[in-house]
A protein has these predicted regions:
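Single conserved hydrophobic/aromatic residue that forms the stacking wall/gate
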Residues: 119-127
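The substrate-binding groove and active-site-proximal loops of carbohydrate-active enzymes
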Residues: 21-31
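Acidic, His- and aromatic-enriched active-site or binding-groove loops in soluble protein domains
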Residues: 68-90
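N-terminal regions that are enriched for targeting/export leaders
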Residues: 2-21
Length: 127
């Protein structure tokens, strides 16, 4: 017989382990853009409570987040270019159209995204 204590301090919950790079992405790699928000919505609808995203540090040898050169820095490839356009840090002209494979491609993303980042503009916040 399975007993369930409604007043138990800890209830059983579940989640998913999926690295950010494994999300679909328009620029060669998954990012914290629209697809990440859609994935969170999917997790909520399917009753999941947790999303473990693994290390977010710059990848090292073999594109592994576990062999990073820094445990404190973040991987810039996970920054979503479309979000930067939406928030006026980039203009749509700063992002050139390019075909990427359907799988995660660090090499292609690394040769593309940093070039787009060079167009970043200072953003003033008006209070």
């Amino acid at each position: 017989m399975l007993l369930k204590d409604k007043d138990a301090k800890y209830q059983r919950e579940s989640g998913v382990l999926l690295h950010i790079s494994s999300l679909p992405g328009a620029h060669g790699i998954g990012s914290f853009g629209k697809e990440a928000y859609e994935f969170v919505d999917f997790l909520k609808k399917s009753g999941q409570k947790y999303w473990q995203i693994l290390p977010l540090c710059p990848v090292g040898k073999g594109n592994s987040p576990y062999s990073s050169v820094s445990a404190f820095a973040g991987e810039i490839l996970f920054i979503d270019l479309n979000t930067l356009v939406r928030d006026s840090y980039l203009s749509p002209d700063d992002i050139t159209e390019r075909e990427f494979p359907e799988h995660t491609d660090y090499k292609a993303a690394r040769s593309y995204k940093p070039v787009s980042y060079t167009h970043l503009r200072a953003h003033e916040t008006v209070l």
